[in-house]
């Protein structure tokens, strides 16, 4: 019998193409902050505890969000290296996030949505990036990828950095494109290990799947420049903001709870699939063919306002598990990596409001 050709790997272990889309490498978005601020980040020892838990769950690929602003990413890589040294069979890989933001992000100003402008203060300049922050994030990503080439398998340039509802910090695609091209040039010159894929992780609309305001020449060039596309989809949030798919139909009201809720969650999954497909459709219109993975989606277990019992009633542990199980089954079958948001609850997300949904996606 003919044997399949062997996979030729470098000393750095499996390649991104062997990991992404492979259900043997389950993915998760990760933040290990225990407290109500990020000032006191987790220690390497605490991160070792976390990755042992995640590994026991079958998670082998983590996504982070910053490189230079906080020490967590570098400590996480050190924690993984320690585990690998102690147990050579231990596997955990990382998609390293580099935070990208506009010039004057987080400035004190008031946004006038009707006129699409800031009415006081300097406000962010969305046409330019924060050069100091962004260059530090990217150059630190290069350093970490080179220091941990057996662990870092991808670099994501920006997190929801192009979606225009991120009014305090978003940039236009040309800024993301600049840094993606910078990383690709670094790979070509040997300044960055070649065994790392480059992407940007953003809302499905930012990747052309919705509002045509995003359909620009710069976005087309970005599609061409990345090694794969990382898409975000959040039916949970749209259960309140765009609830056409959400809720129990009159014909379902008499059904048992599990069946009734299951049908509701099936529609949430269909909604997520539709957003994913919209990106594929737009990319196809451009004549571009790249792998598309889900860089972020999730479901909160608690909310005291819009998504809780007085709102869309989406937030609870039962629906969280139902969403996770259904979406994970589909992505495994389709060969799509799913970075589920997120591994653990993080109190710093909205420290002044303990019941806010952002604190309860873990």
Regions inferred by a protein language model and the residue ranges of each:
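N-terminal Sec signal peptide cleavage junction
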Residues: 3-5
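Substrate-binding cleft of extracellular glycoside hydrolase catalytic domains
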Residues: 12, 74-196, 294
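Aromatic-rich peripheral "rim/lid" segments of glycoside hydrolase catalytic domains that contact
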Residues: 7-19, 23, 305-362
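N-terminal carbohydrate-binding/catalytic regions of secreted carbohydrate-active enzymes
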Residues: 13-109, 131-138
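Alpha-helical scaffolding within the catalytic cores
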Residues: 10-15, 49, 75-78, 136-143, ...
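Noncatalytic carbohydrate-binding groove/subsite architecture in carbohydrate-active enzymes
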Residues: 129-133, 153, 162-294, 300-304
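The substrate-binding groove and active-site-proximal loops of carbohydrate-active enzymes
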Residues: 35-41, 59-65, 97-103, 120-132, ...
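Hydrophobic faces of well-ordered beta-strands that scaffold small-molecule active sites
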Residues: 26-30, 60-64, 90-98, 153-157, ...
């Amino acid at each position: 019998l003919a044997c399949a050709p062997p996979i030729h790997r470098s000393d750095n272990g499996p390649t991104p193409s062997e990991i992404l889309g492979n259900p043997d490498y389950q993915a998760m978005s990760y933040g290990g902050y225990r407290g109500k601020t990020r000032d006191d980040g987790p220690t390497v020892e605490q991160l070792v505890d976390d990755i042992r838990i995640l590994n026991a769950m079958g998670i082998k690929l983590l996504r982070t969000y910053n490189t230079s602003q906080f020490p967590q990413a570098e400590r996480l890589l050190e924690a993984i290296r320690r585990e690998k040294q102690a147990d050579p069979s231990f596997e955990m890989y990382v998609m390293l996030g580099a935070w990208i933001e506009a010039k004057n992000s987080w400035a004190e100003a008031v946004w006038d949505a009707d006129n699409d402008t800031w009415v006081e203060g300097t406000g962010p300049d969305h046409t330019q990036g924060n050069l100091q922050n962004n260059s530090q994030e990217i150059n630190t990503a290069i350093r970490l990828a080179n220091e941990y080439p057996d662990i870092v398998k991808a670099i994501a340039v920006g997190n929801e950095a192009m979606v225009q509802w991120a009014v305090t910090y978003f940039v236009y695609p040309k800024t993301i494109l600049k840094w993606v091209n910078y990383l690709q040039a670094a790979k070509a010159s040997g300044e960055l290990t070649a065994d790392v894929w480059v992407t940007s992780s953003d809302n499905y609309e930012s990747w052309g799947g919705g509002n045509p305001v995003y359909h620009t020449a710069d976005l087309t060039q970005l599609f061409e420049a990345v090694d794969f596309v990382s898409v975000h989809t959040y039916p949970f949030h749209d259960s309140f903001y765009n609830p056409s798919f959400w809720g129990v139909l009159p014909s379902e009201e008499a059904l048992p709870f599990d069946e009734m809720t299951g049908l509701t969650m099936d529609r949430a999954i269909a909604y997520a699939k539709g957003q994913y497909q919209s990106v594929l459709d737009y990319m196809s219109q451009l004549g571009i063919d790249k792998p598309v993975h889900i860089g972020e989606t999730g479901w909160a277990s608690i909310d005291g306002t819009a998504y809780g019992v007085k709102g869309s009633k989406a937030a609870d542990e039962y629906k969280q598990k139902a969403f996770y199980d259904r979406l994970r089954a589909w992505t495994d079958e389709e060969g799509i990596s799913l970075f589920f948001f997120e591994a653990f609850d993080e109190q710093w997300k909205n420290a002044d409001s303990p019941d806010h949904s952002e604190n309860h996606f873990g």
